[in-house]
């Protein structure tokens, strides 16, 4: 067993592409080795902004020898009319190094038995350039030199070592060898690697921490140590830590500061300037107040660190000066003046202005406020917030820091005298900003956020701007997923079709299928029964909360003894009703059996209270009240009676069963086998 090292040296890779790139390289290497039957124990990944590297441990010296059968021509064309081997069979056998007489007939085809010898690891690995590296794909490419080769960034060097032997191959004008390179500034020299096993220990000696997880742990430890020394609190934000880790090869954390006068600017602005724009970690005192300091990480050692600190402070102060200016100037603006100007700001060229979008959102929000049971005072707040909630788009601060949309709206609204509910709704209407992001906390904010998302989705669908495949430029999938999460959290019950009707020419089915797909995705992240999820999302009305609750309730009963017969009896009813051309009115006078009357009575008793029953109670009623009555009905009644009036009456009775149960789910889609 041997170890193999592959290192691809590159120009600086964008931070967000480093981790996906090394993961892809490892996956492609694993697939390549498996395809070539070259066994190994594990693949260890290394990555920095300038290199992607792998060590394959426990590699076999050669690939596995195998005996295989190769499928050839069919028996129908194997011989000619005289019984001689055909040209097709002769050509096939020749290609396999055999004679026609060596072939084996299995069923309708001839097969050649073939022994495939093992291939030396060196020979297989010499194809890594073409079969692994050249086949990598990226969201962003670069082209260099006079060729058509594309890669994430230009390749500068390649190391390819099987233990202490070079496995040579060429990729463009780069020949794989044993020479890596150190840190760009601290050790900008070639580093000779005598053995693949030297990599992890040799590179840190040249100021390159190639192990990304070790480097991240080192960054975390340094930041926490500096925070502790200064009695600060600091949060190691996951995404920021990942980004910083992927822009340095040899990290050294340091402390910087800024004038406390800038603390008069809202903390969110300062944090955005530091964290999002400069990749700094903000720090807080022990009372949880933002301190006029930050922690950052340089790509180098502590030499001349004071110059690095001054440079970073200077860059930050420039941004804080802008922030302070906008904060003061924006407070001179009036909300009503900014709202008036939104009529000239385009929401989308095919849809209209932001003012028009807000007007539609206000109408939707009013309906939602009724559905949500808001108080009259809350409804006033919903209306007011819907009238102004986009005003901060025209402030200087949001123009400079667009990440602060909504956040600044809340602050400026409070300064202008708007009440807390209205101000909070302005901030919360963007929520959630990610798949698992925070949801609005207030009722008014929840209504506004949902209404804004409903109008956005319906508006884009109305003009034909519909997501296809992975293409979703207007983030409509995210909007719908956020809408679903808000509706579920607030436990709102309403049919989404109510809001689609306000748009002329809407393709209702297309929109509902789009939303249904998002509900399905969310449910399948939590439940393992696809059929139960399908049944729930195909209920007779488009009540998202009902769909979600139904799926969980049905799934919770799937192992109970009455589950199977109950589902089968309801499904039988559904299938019979589906076959009926027309459904008549029920006439109890046509009942001939007691079980018909009993089923009718069960349906009527449930109908009177069905709308307001929770899903759990609905399902228990279906299992324990309705299903036994259906079973008795089927045991004692011939549904397809010769008397057409009696037959139609029985189908009509079953249609009422279906109407009742389908409010919860389409039970015919559940597999009981």
UniProtKB/Swiss-Prot annotation:
SS bond list: none
What's its EC?
Answer: 6.1.1.14
| Keyword field contains DNA damage | no
Q: Keywords on this record?
A: Aminoacyl-tRNA synthetase, ATP-binding, Cytoplasm, Ligase, Nucleotide-binding, Protein biosynthesis
| Broad enzyme group | ligase
Cellular compartments annotated = Cytoplasm
What InterPro entries is this protein classified in? Gly-tRNA-synth_bsu, Gly-tRNA-synth_heterodimer
* UniProt feature coiled coil, ranges: none
A Gene Ontology biological process in which this protein takes part is: glycyl-tRNA aminoacylation
| Gene Ontology cellular-component terms listed | cytosol
Per the record's keyword annotation, is Glycosyltransferase included, yes or no?
Answer: no
Kindly name one Pfam family recorded for this protein: tRNA_synt_2f
| Catalytic reaction list | tRNA(Gly) + glycine + ATP = glycyl-tRNA(Gly) + AMP + diphosphate
| GO function term, MF aspect, one | glycine-tRNA ligase activity
The record's listing under HAMAP family reads: Gly_tRNA_synth_beta
Q: What family does the entry list? A: Belongs to the class-II aminoacyl-tRNA synthetase family.
NCBIfam families in the cross-refs: glyS
Oligomeric state and interaction partners are given as: Tetramer of two alpha and two beta subunits.
This protein is called Glycine--tRNA ligase beta subunit
What is the protein's species of origin? Answer: Lactococcus lactis subsp. cremoris (strain SK11)
